[in-house]
């Protein structure tokens, strides 16, 4: 399962990208773009991320994954094809001579940080409920 190593890297990237102050800053979401060719299982990655995010500013963050399809351009007829199964061939001319133009991505596209005012209000609300 390579998802654990990837989750560790995502957590490190996210933690290094957020400001150090205020100390109680919370991350709401980490948004990823993941290509189908990476062979990442989204549910496994979310599970691993939850483990590595524990006791960090990422602990309550949602891991949003946008799956990027495998797209190739035929070297014979220049048709752009979305690859949906193991048959890596041009949908128009059936050639197997393709250049992959997307599907290998693994990118942290954005990180959403909780608004400090929202955090204060949520803390006040939780104190009142106790």
UniProtKB/Swiss-Prot annotation:
Transmembrane segments: none
Gene Ontology terms for molecular function: nickel cation binding; zinc ion binding
Cell inner membrane found in the keyword field: no
Source organism, top-level taxon: Bacteria
Gene3D superfamilies cross-referenced by the UniProt entry: 3.30.2320.80
Disulphides: none
Residues involved in Zn(2+) binding: 74, 77, 90, 93
Annotated binding of Ni(2+), by residue: 2
Pfam families, A to Z: HypA (PF01155)
InterPro entries registered for this protein in UniProt: Hydgase_Ni_incorp_HypA/HybF_CS (IPR020538), HypA/HybF (IPR000688)
Keywords associated with the record: Metal-binding, Nickel, Zinc
GO BP term, example: protein maturation
Family note: Belongs to the HypA/HybF family.
Role noted for this protein: Involved in the maturation of [NiFe] hydrogenases. Required for nickel insertion into the metal center of the hydrogenase.
Family annotation (PANTHER family): HYDROGENASE MATURATION FACTOR HYPA
The protein, known as: Hydrogenase maturation factor HypA
Organism listed in the record: Desulfatibacillum aliphaticivorans
